[in-house]
Amino acid sequence: MRQLKGKPKKETSKDKKERKQAMQEARQQITTVVLPTLAVVVALIVVFVYVATRPNTIE
């Protein structure tokens, strides 16, 4: 039976498996890329605030 234009085709088990695998890879990228990058950004902000607010000791 022909598919009509604009109507989405029914998802096969192969399509579902590929979609699940893609989601799993996306979750792995979150832990390997996003979290370390976020940690570096937070560390830079903390260092900047520390340097900007430390008392200057002039003798």
Swiss-Prot record:
<keyword id="KW-0175">Coiled coil</keyword>
<keyword id="KW-1133">Transmembrane helix</keyword>
<feature type="coiled-coil region">
    <location>
        <begin position="9"/>
        <end position="31"/>
    </location>
</feature>
<comment type="similarity">
    <text>Belongs to the SMCO4 family.</text>
</comment>
<protein>
    <recommendedName>
        <fullName>Single-pass membrane and coiled-coil domain-containing protein 4</fullName>
    </recommendedName>
</protein>
<feature type="region of interest" description="Disordered">
    <location>
        <begin position="1"/>
        <end position="23"/>
    </location>
</feature>
<dbReference type="Pfam" id="PF15012">
    <property type="entry name" value="DUF4519"/>
</dbReference>
<dbReference type="GO" id="GO:0016020">
    <property type="term" value="C:membrane"/>
</dbReference>
<keyword id="KW-0472">Membrane</keyword>
<feature type="transmembrane region" description="Helical">
    <location>
        <begin position="32"/>
        <end position="52"/>
    </location>
</feature>
<feature type="compositionally biased region" description="Basic and acidic residues">
    <location>
        <begin position="9"/>
        <end position="22"/>
    </location>
</feature>
<dbReference type="InterPro" id="IPR027960">
    <property type="entry name" value="DUF4519"/>
</dbReference>
<keyword id="KW-0812">Transmembrane</keyword>
